[in-house]
Amino acid sequence: MLGAMLHTLLLLLLAELGALLASGPESQSSFLEIIFPEKIEDKTHSEEQISYIIPINKKQYTVHLQKRYFLTNRFMVYMYNQGSTSFHSPNIPAQCYYQGHIKGYPNSVATLSTCSGLRGFLQFENVSYGIEPLQSAFTSQHIVYKLGNKEKELIFNKNSRNIEMPTNYGILINKKPKSPFKNLFPLYLEMSIVVDKALYDYLGSDSNIVTNKIIEIISLINSVFAQLKVTIVLSSLELWSDKNKIPTVGEADELLHKFLEWKQAYLTLRPHDVAYLFIYNEYPNYMGATYPGKMCTAHYSAGITMYPKDMTLEAFSVILTQMLGLSLGISYDEPEKCYCSESICIMNPRAMQYGGVKSFSNCSLNDFEHFKSNEGAKCLQNKPQMQRTAAAVCGNGKVEGDEICDCGSEAECGPDSCCEPNRCVLKAGRACDSKSPSSTCCKNCQFLPEKHQCRPEKHLYCDIPEVCNGSSGNCPPDVTINNGHVCKESGTICYNGDCPDLDRVCESIYGAGSVNAPFACYEEIQGQNDRFGNCGKDNRNRYVFCGWRNLICGRLICTYPTRMPYNPPNNSTASVIYAFVRDKVCITVDFGSSVKEDPLRVANGATCDLDRICLNGVCVESRFLRDQSKTCSSKCHGNGVCNSHGVCHCNAGYSPPNCQYPTTKRSASLWSGKHDLPMERASKNQEKKWLLSLYIVLIILASVFLIGTGWKGLKQCGSKEEESMSSESKSEDSTYTYVSRSTSETSSMTSTSS
């Protein structure tokens, strides 16, 4: 019977794959902006409906959001390790996904998650923006970037066929009436997704990262299917993390057939309406395959979809939406006969090339009504139990749900534990769990006293130490001085509580006299794009070339102050490279696999050029951060600075919220757990004024004395012997590269004239 059905197999031979950019902001279009989204608080404090103000390109947009649920309460992630299967409930909250619209733009769609900062997409009528938090979500800093658009050139595989439109859908598509939307009742499509090994690696080789990206795709798809009152529910996710379980190369019908056989053998016990295999292919000949109109036919409810190189999640969600639409009996639109309220309809063959909101056309709705009238949607009428709260598991070492504490198993907890291991509550007489990593204000199961420092400052002028409040075992959240506050005379600005000083880092590694190398050294070493000089690695473990503008934002290169070879401490696997460039000896080290984080990776916030800082390997303008910090701190009346929440943090002797009036009470800001600004910092300006007055008086006295003694000496001295000047010849600039792999290995030297 399967062979008889293959003639209805629909191949998506769409070659519009090109130059749709990767799903990270670093490879998006040139528009990229650092922003500070602001949540609009309401009196109800309900999280079911929330709103944000999001600035884009100097304009404020108000986004209204409604919570959406599309993970089943039995949702599991399946993985493989050396052939054995493991499954787990992912550590991902199910109640932080939202959909909504942008105020004043009736055809807009917002698809965002709030699990850790704001992450997702803002889709206007013909343009889309991605938004995601920077590394430290507590700073409220996000980046917003413009997604690819229809102007991008198309890249074709040299073996790919021309664009073909399917000719036989098994559905009547001509002369579609322009009927209004009919009343629809809610339907639920349970989906099981399988990710092949290549795509798993391409998306990050990390189960949490890949799971989050798949959920983002499902969220985008739901924003389109909401028009049909269809909710796409993710029931299970399988990651082929070690190797593929079936071959993933070949013709579309062959792959679909193999996946269908595998699905029937291995997914039987996992409830689902349809199963899809996502395959990574850099330049595929086709986009996917499925059986049109067979969603509720168990032996044919499957599909495969290709994920090309450099494709955005938004573009891939369009492909998957079209595939699911075909399975639901919805054919491709004929543009001259079908219309929708958007600039392009979702079932238009070229929809994936366009940014912005997309919707189903009148033709699509008629197709779907026809599909339902023939009982094609009977399997979609049962509503699965949705996962609305994270299920707490007592004994796993994580505090979840209503748990007060969780120290793990009985053996892990031990007899001295503050926590009851089987009930996850505190033992009688215990105030807190001192074994919990987050309980830095707890000792011997009791609260530490008020004012006890629980988190030291990273930098004197960019951070403030947190102290315990005496009534909680947890240290207050980390709040820093606002990013953009100038922390050094050279113009360096605060970033995430630190004052990134490359000279200081060089000195700490190589000793006194070592400073950040001149740009010529970065050109020489970073230009090689190898383990010594690069801007990180991509998803395929290849070194990323920094580009001329971003050379200083890769790996740190320093000047070397001595003639003794550098010996990395306690690291026999490290390799050292020296470069002699324009009379400077420059150095950098590859620490190899012995370190988890590269200590020479240039930190975010480090200065890379005039009025520019490094941000995720890119040299970007710092003007916005500086201006935002100045504007915020201007409301502190010169007696304080803004913190990372945009609230004045007052100098000693001044009271919040605006540091305008003196106070006898020591209170730095409205945020509890914070000391005042240090006294030496608060009185810095007054001290400078006093010292300046003293210097002026001393200078006047010294001048009077020197004039008197100078006149006397002038009489006694008739002439002065001239000194001869010695001249120095200067050699031409040369570049020398010396690589020392270890003390036992042979050293080599190459030279090129510049």
Swiss-Prot record:
Q: Is tRNA processing among the key words of this record?
A: no
Task: Return the Basic and acidic residues bias intervals.
Answer: 720-733
Transmembrane residues, as ranges?
690-710
Q: Which GO terms describe its molecular function?
A: metalloendopeptidase activity
- Which residues does the UniProt record annotate as the domain Peptidase M12B? 187-384
- As given in the record, the signal peptide range reads 1-22
Q: Which cysteines are joined by disulfide bonds?
A: C296-C379, C338-C363, C340-C345, C454-C475, C632-C642, C636-C648, C650-C659
Protein name per its UniProtKB record:
Disintegrin and metalloproteinase domain-containing protein 32
Name the gene for this chain: Adam32
